[in-house]
Amino acid sequence: ASSAASAVYKRQPVEQQRLEKEQIEDMGSIYRTRGAHAIHCLTVIGQVEGHVEAPQGQKTTKYEHVIPQLVAVQEDPAIEGLLVLLNTVGGDVEAGLALAELIASISKPSAAVVLGGGHSIGIPLAVSAQRSFIVPTATMTVHPVRHSGMILGVPQTMRWFEQMQERITGFVAAHSGISEKRYTELMMRTGELVMDVGTVLDGRKAVREKLIDELGGLSDALAWLYREIEGK
């Protein structure tokens, strides 16, 4: 099968091969796979970068790169489904939540797989797909919204944090099996993280808490996507 796929790739025009190689290097994505069904593969790695550029040397997923890809997934009739692979430490809250809302609004079958980590704002991204998977060794850190840099120590600032957290908690509860109450309990737990509040969930615990739908990896996600596409 691999030799056949290689032969198909070699027959492609050189320009198309070059463009696909550049897309993988620049965007971390594949326009669409060449399996039985055309699946767009999107990777969310490192830090989700939003309105402010991350420090040099950090791996990032730029939301201005991801948004056009998600629009293409919805609009292009040749693309039949979306596969999101996550290994992220989190990042810009509003940018991450915006991407999660976009993924959730795609009408085509979508699946997400949490690999190394799906921390912080990576959690809404993981549950935004129609079906979520997590490998046993992956971890997800549930903790409150944080802010780096100087802030005004006034009640209005604290209320802003509360409102942002309510948006995230509501989204996660709406797109997974966990309740807002239970998610808040995990988020505010003390004694597990050093000098912080929150909970670290491995793959099995994330499924047990109904945060993620299913324990599984790439083949499981692709099998689910194929079933959904063929069932339409």
In which residue ranges do the predicted regions lie?
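Short, small-residue-biased leader/transition segments that mark boundaries at the very start
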Residues: 2-9
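STAS-typified acidic loop motif
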Residues: 13-64
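Short, well-ordered alpha-helix to beta-strand connector turns
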Residues: 5, 129-130, 212
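Structural motif
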Residues: 41-43, 81-85, 113
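Terminal peptide-recognition signature
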Residues: 44, 84, 126, 140, ...
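Charged, glycine-interspersed solvent-exposed loop segments at helix/strand-loop junctions
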Residues: 81, 143-229
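Glycine-rich beta-to-alpha active-site loop
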Residues: 85-99, 104-149
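A short, well-ordered alpha-helical element
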Residues: 54-80
